[in-house]
Regions:
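Charged catalytic cores and adjacent phosphate/nucleic-acid-binding surfaces used
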Residues: 1-128
Length: 128
């Protein structure tokens, strides 16, 4: 059962059209479409989901539903602040120095600004 993750709630932080590129690839190659939260903090869980309309909650029923196209993509872009938080955790775990924390502070400010600018920008996706 082959497919492509066409919605990742964090992917567009690094590559602006990452999800669109994945969507185009899936369509071009006739692959099933999936979504993922890529959650690094609890608040991101569920920001990308594949909703499957299966007859029962069994592996066989889920596989059959996916094979017949019984899945929808739902999600929303994760807030930039969550990315900043996960980067702070990374710095703490690696015992980063002051320069790394200064870079993080600048990154965190950028993330906060992005969240303010993008608030309500229509980034929710429902089976696009």
């Amino acid at each position: 059962l082959d497919g492509v993750e066409v919605w990742n709630s964090r992917a567009e932080r690094k590559i602006a059209d990452a999800n669109s590129l994945a969507e185009a690839f899936a369509r071009e190659h006739g692959l099933r479409r999936f979504a993922g939260s890529d959650a690094h903090v609890p608040q991101e869980i569920g920001h990308g989901v594949t909703v499957i309309q299966a007859e029962a909650c069994t592996l066989e029923a889920v596989k059959a539903a996916l094979l017949r196209g019984g899945a929808r993509i739902q999600g929303c872009r994760s807030r930039a602040w969550h990315t900043a938080r996960s980067q702070l955790t990374k710095r703490k775990k690696t015992k980063a120095g002051p320069v790394a924390y200064a870079k993080w502070a600048a990154f965190a400010l950028k993330c906060c600004a992005q969240d303010l600018i993008r608030k309500g920008d229509g980034t929710d996706v429902t089976d696009r």
